[in-house]
Amino acid sequence: MKIFDCFTYFNEDDLLRVRLETLAAHVDHFVIAEATHTQSGLPKPLNFRPALFEKFRDKIIYVAVDDMPVHLNDAWANENHQRRALMRGLSAAAFDDLVMVSDLDEIPHPARLNAYEPRFYRGTFIQRLFYYRFNNEALDPVTLAPQSWRGTQITTYHHLLDFFGDTQNLRIYKPTGLLRSAKRQWLKAFRNQDIADGGWHFSWVMTGERILTKINSMAHQEFNTDPIASIEAINRRLLEGHDILQRNIRFRRVALDSQFPEFIVVHRDEFKDLIL
């Protein structure tokens, strides 16, 4: 049985490095899908540089997505198409192989990969949620309890083909037909396994300049407004401990310890600009 770790990529080399170093000893292949257009439909270069990740060359299956439906002028259609393109990297998978689908910044805990039970159609890794910096944990604004994130999804290749159909539908199950709502509830209640202590969601962990680039290119164009989309505003809100996207979220700085990926802890000096 092999494990395929599948995710989309834009230009997040720091997070990609953390992900590869954290999971390389535990998965057989990384399937990386990168598109020639942003989610908002703008042309972009292919940013993945194999030379930076030469030590993982034998594990990486790279998919360049050059057929984005940008003519639809639909950011969500572009995002979904890029995620579906991960299927193109699974041609060598066998029915009993495991397939994980994530956003790049959702890193499953390597010690929890074997917690998934294939009698469930899907496993969902419940992950700790951090924003903007590796140790800037998101809190509920009312209770101040740490927020969790339903991130990485895992299934067998057989379930992926026979039940979900593709990697986008594994990520967000949207059946069709008159019974679609009942099917969603049935999956959630009886065929989805929540996997506790499931890793980390390092959302928007990048420099202010890259945050601005992401705002300009992402599907969530409601955030691309003048008060938010400037380097000055981004840096100011980071220093003040406020949410850059002006959402109702509180944060706390937590110690960088053994609860984090070992690679971040060991190389904290290299990541000093991404740590509080």
Model regions and ranges:
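N-proximal low-complexity "stem/linker" segments adjacent to membrane-targeting elements
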Residues: 1-25, 266-269, 274-276
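Short His-Asn-centered micro-motif
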Residues: 5-10, 33-34, 101-104, 125-128
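Short, well-formed alpha-helical segments that are part of the catalytic scaffolds
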Residues: 12-32, 39-48
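Short, structured coil segments at secondary-structure junctions
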Residues: 26, 56-58, 118-119
